[in-house]
Amino acid sequence: MDMKAHYIDGAMHLGCSEEHFTTYNPANGEPLANVKQANQQDMQAAIESAKRGFAIWSAMTATERSRILLKAVALLRERNDELAALEVADTGKPIQEANCVDIATGADVIEYYAGLAPSMHGEQQPLNESQFFYTRREPLGICAGIGAWNYPIQIAMWKSAPALAAGNAMIFKPSEETPLTALKLAEIYSEAGLPDGVFNVIQGDYRVGQMLTAHPDIAKVSFTGESGTGKVVMGDSAATLKQVTMELGGKSPMIIFDDAKLDDAVSAAMVANFYTQGEVCTHGTRVFVHEGIYDEFVVQLKKRTELLVVGDPLDEQTQIGALISKEHESKVLSAIEQAKASKATLLTGGYKVTENGLASGNFVVPTVFIDCEDDMPHVQQEIFGPVMSVLKFSDEDEVIARANNTDYGLAAGVFTQNLSRAHRVIHQIQAGICWINTWGDSPAEMPVGGYKLSGIGRENGVETLTHYTQTKSVLVHLGDFDSPYA
């Protein structure tokens, strides 16, 4: 079996450690590769490489950087199918998703920031006849990206795109569950002309993350993951006053009013709970349905959910793939059993899929609980699997209060034909990413991130460039210096 490791200084780097771990295919439990665990020597090699790369990259013009990033975009799109197949093997998600979303949307973000790079500028303001000041937006230096396992290559692109466009270098640590596609991205960056050391990949578990957050030469950490780990990352980064942005967990509300287009609302609820087998932080797992359409909604939801195809992720017909690991599958099934023991009603699903040759994989059937209450554990806690909670509401003020009754604040959505109500409600929801009459779209131009325990800072959009630059102010005096001393 192949031994994978790190990507440092423009080349694969087997590393200095003998320790390694194995990554498995979630769909069948078969090993994909052995991967070296980084140690301090590997980390320092990546740091020194990034320093050299940063010196070259930051000295290039923004237009030169843009051309290289656009070349990477072309290569990514050219190799979309190859990268998607590898992503499916590593994550267990359906190929129909990976083929059209994961690489494509990541490449869109790189293209977006490549376009913005030459337009980055400071300000200039005259103060009086002999003085003016100007500002420069300068790169931070070496940035660390710590990725999650649900969208490995997309997250690597989302984090590296603004960092590189602004002139920084990046050391990226993928999740140990999904270590493979970040290496392919690094190779593509190099092929596109990125100077050696500007994008390094270093592999391993939480210990590697701790090395990154503790290292004094890392200027910024961008983390995607669950909220508890985010608190640790932020605490560790505080010792050296690193800039931190993080996109964390959620338990997002979807609010469906009685005038909503019912077919659209059911479709959106399914996408917002079952896409990528439920392993999406922005999923709308608390579905609030107005009492006037509740029964009809439930009937349609049950019928359509039971038509979803669970199967081999490489089969184009498969709509629901495999959960990332046996451990995570066990966690999801445990949450389902806890929900079964509550006063909620199991509408459909609620079990591990074992037929049709799927027993060796981590497959859980799409599951819906109705008649849920706000204080039930499966309603309050992030499950990160294909588990939907449906709750009934009667009026606008009530549902707003209930929707906000959570420590999370990542996403929210409203379905109604009354646009005044749609905007009125959305403006009162405590969430950073909101949709009206749709769910899940995240274009490169739109900043995304959470309120409360769902994160700090934003990814994508113009705003994100402020997280990867620092402002230098320069005051210029044109006359003689008027000293207060003789």
UniProtKB/Swiss-Prot annotation:
K(+) 1 binds at T23, D90. PROSITE patterns: ALDEHYDE_DEHYDR_GLU. NAD(+) binds at G147, A148, W149, K173, P174, S175, E176, E226, S227, G228, T229, G249, C281, E382. Pathway: Amine and polyamine biosynthesis; betaine biosynthesis via choline pathway; betaine from betaine aldehyde: step 1/1. The modification Cysteine sulfenic acid (-SOH) is found at C281. K(+) 2 binds at L241, K452, G455. Keywords: Metal-binding, NAD, NADP, Oxidation, Oxidoreductase, Potassium. One of its GO terms (molecular function) is betaine-aldehyde dehydrogenase (NAD+) activity. GO terms for biological process: glycine betaine biosynthetic process from choline. The active site is at K159 (charge relay system), E247 (proton acceptor), C281 (nucleophile), E459 (charge relay system). Its EC number is 1.2.1.8. InterPro entries: Ald_DH/histidinol_DH, Ald_DH_C, Ald_DH_CS_GLU, Ald_DH_N, Aldehyde_DH_dom, BADH. The keyword ATP-binding does not apply. It catalyses: betaine aldehyde + NAD(+) + H2O = glycine betaine + NADH + 2 H(+). This is Betaine aldehyde dehydrogenase. It comes from Vibrio campbellii (strain ATCC BAA-1116). Dimer of dimers.
